[in-house]
Amino acid sequence: MSLDTVVEDIRDEAQARASEIQADADERAEKIIEEAEADAEDILEERKDEVEEQIEREREQALSSANLEAKQNRLEARRDVLDDVLNRVEDELASLSNAKREELTKPLVTAAITEFDDDETVKLYARADDADLLNSLLEEHEKAEYAGEYDCLGGVVAEGQQSRVRVNNTFDSILDAVWEETLGDVSEQLFDQ
């Protein structure tokens, strides 16, 4: 065997080995690329899922906030309507006719006075516009006297000199009590359909 043949055999063997190594490297590179592409696809799908979940969370949060704001607006509107109803009732009480005012005030005066002992002097306070009415109603009650003004829609506040008892029989206090008792019914009639 000649040297050229040996060199040729070594070269052929080296080329075959190089081709084998190259093919193996290409196969491994292709496998790595396929795995990387699969990983990239998985990562892309994960990111898409995360983005979709984030979008859904933000959408739910926005809907929840909008629903809460709408509910608050409805409640505020209802409160405004109820306040308007209460103000209209107060206006009607403040502008009662003299006959109606006397009809409503007389039992309040009597009820207030009966809360005190028979021998106790009772001082009654009323709104300034009702001073004459109160003085005429007190003509029937010897132990009671008009003592001055009280800021209210009508009715009386009575105080005993000895017992330090105070009875609030004003239209305001009665309206407050009735309003608290009937607020649910009023609200239901106005808003439930």
Curated annotation (Swiss-Prot):
Membrane topology: Peripheral membrane protein
Subcellular location: Cell membrane
GO cellular component term, pick one: proton-transporting two-sector ATPase complex, catalytic domain
This protein's record includes keyword ATP-binding: no
Molecular function in Gene Ontology: ATP binding; proton-transporting ATP synthase activity, rotational mechanism; proton-transporting ATPase activity, rotational mechanism
Database matches in InterPro entries: ATPase_E_C, ATPase_V1_Esu
Disulphide bridges: none
GO biological process: proton motive force-driven plasma membrane ATP synthesis
Principal subcellular localisation of the protein: membrane
Keywords in alphabetical order: ATP synthesis, Cell membrane, Hydrogen ion transport, Ion transport, Membrane, Transport
Transmembrane segments: none
PANTHER family named among the record's database cross-references: ATPASE H+-TRANSPORTING V1 SUBUNIT E1A-RELATED
Family listed: Belongs to the V-ATPase E subunit family.
Purpose of the protein: Component of the A-type ATP synthase that produces ATP from ADP in the presence of a proton gradient across the membrane.
Record note on quaternary structure: Has multiple subunits with at least A(3), B(3), C, D, E, F, H, I and proteolipid K(x).
Name listed for the protein in its UniProt record: A-type ATP synthase subunit E
Organism (species): Haloquadratum walsbyi (strain DSM 16790 / HBSQ001)
Organism taxonomic ancestry: Archaea, Methanobacteriati, Methanobacteriota, Stenosarchaea group, Halobacteria
Protein encoded by which gene: atpE
